[in-house]
């Protein structure tokens, strides 16, 4: 915006009336772009124009002068505005849309204008601005005494949730899970690093996060006296965030939010917790490069509807612990799979489409004619859907069927009210169906020229005056007229008033035709005004059905997810997992759900056995041998079981899980100034602090980012801590062969390896998991595969032989001048002299004197 040191009244007085109006509206929306409607364009001025010019790559011009200065200006055509808005929203920008609401014909001075909507990344509902199969969330974050309050809303579905992460790690995981398009935070928010590199961050006044203000806002939204009924009364920090969020959404939408009906507490103890690193490493919905190819969601998501696809992704990102709900889902999938009804459901559901987002636009009264046409089409599918579902017996599926009952009254209303193929917008009419309103039909007939009246008038005038060439016509210049050929013009009566002379004819007007013309011209505007009124009344008629429609959308989305998982289970040969109460993971013939889909050759299935007596597997084997794939597939199978899906295995028995941790791969975090090793150690520290006996931990190549001794020491100590202090179910892949000694000194550990076979200078990876430690690492063979020059490989092989020879010699025979590279640090503690002395003593055979002597001997050995 233009900057000035003068007071607002002083500075405005120097501007033209139109710019005064603009500056007043801009002052009400100082932090966002203002699209100011002028005729067929939306214009931006001053700093907004400069910013829009850069972001949208549009021309920056100047508009005359105001207050003695040229005004920077940029604009976009009104008919193309949605494309520009989509681009800005993708960049995290917010835009206020200012429309002309006054009549230019009657306005004295500038036409009255008003901001009619504010488009923000987290509150958009227009189809053109949304990703069809991804949730579009807005969130608010609050921080107090090291703890957080967090609230999210999906305005396109009405879901409104809060949570209270206890640590920065938990908060970071929540931000990654929910990926809000817009994030509100208080002005005094201190852990700003949590929001680094995020688009759409919005600073809000501190008072908007006050608890009393928040409760007042929420009670006002829900029409309640308190929040006890929602079970969120004790979540004070979460409520602070939720209050700010609901106020912001109301302010931007400029209307009521009738579809936001409840607030739920998203408790961590109900979910299998995945931290940010785990979501990234397991490539659930995004791969490591940031795309969506080759992810778990890509493999599992063949949903018929966008709302089903979005629900499936929510399930994937929030696996649950409640076995009753999971078995309910599995029972439903089993019936759909065994009856093959998924094949009949899919095409019907596809016809229903994305009614969830249509309902949000309906609630906000921003639905367009084609939204209601699509809603009508969805309603028309319900009888067939209900018929297909009538064959289902499983209780959860029959419950879903009750929420998908045909809505005949609503369907009939939409069939009567909306034309078969309505235009995109109501602006020019043509939306309300013929026959819905007798008054509208009458005005439309007039607007279309009322051909019956004209035909009758033409016949009467022709017969009355005996003029057989007489006919009634219309053109845009002269309106309605009576045309008579020049040869019969002498028969025209005196009350005919000549309007136009042509070469071979004369055109006349009579009072009766003039009255009709006035009525017709007036009828077009009357018909359009009445149609817009009927359109608004239609919203009022639909609103009482909103809650039932939302239940329908939720049930159809869930049915879609279940039929989709049934189809995936059948076509990808998945098995039903057994969820048990005993700790452990037992998988036979497990496969990686993503890798097996992209491989050209058959995937080698592998078993895994983790139980209270076998809590940690030390995994060794060559690089590229499949260690990381084996670990990831175990985590993905466990995760899929905890969303209630069939899994890629011959059989699977999965015990209770509270968290899944992964420490797999790493790269420099340049934005935060952290090295590869620092990233690795930060993730390791998070695991060692937060893992429990019911956690599944994946540790891959710990310690490789530092020196050999440091790395080996850290890897050994981390494995020992996980085994002795935590007892978590752990897959620990390592290239430090010294760690294969751990199962010999600690209980509940075992060695497994992935083998390979060398032939000449080449190597064949077997990808099969076998018991015991690997015999060698095959590092040189892998280097050869990678294209390392043969002379380098040959030299490395010679050095390897020297090192192996060195390590086999007794230490005292080695030349002191040679660097002792091969003498690796032994991490298995040798017995001390005291321990050796005590080992040979039988306390029961010692006399008091002998015991005293032994004590003095031990003292000397210390």
UniProtKB/Swiss-Prot annotation:
GO terms for cellular component: cytosol. Disulfide bonds: none annotated. It comes from the Bacteria. ATP binds at residues 621-628. The keyword ATP-binding applies. InterPro entries: DNA_mismatch_repair_MutS, DNA_mismatch_repair_MutS-lik_N, DNA_mismatch_repair_MutS/MSH, DNA_mismatch_repair_MutS_C, DNA_mismatch_repair_MutS_clamp, DNA_mismatch_repair_MutS_core, DNA_mismatch_repair_MutS_N, DNA_mismatch_repair_MutS_sf. Signal peptide: none annotated. Keywords: ATP-binding, DNA damage, DNA repair, DNA-binding, Nucleotide-binding. CDD domains: ABC_MutS1 (cd03284). One of its GO terms (biological process) is mismatch repair. Coiled coil: none annotated. Belongs to the DNA mismatch repair MutS family. This protein is involved in the repair of mismatches in DNA. It is possible that it carries out the mismatch recognition step. This protein has a weak ATPase activity. This is DNA mismatch repair protein MutS. It comes from Vibrio cholerae serotype O1 (strain ATCC 39315 / El Tor Inaba N16961).
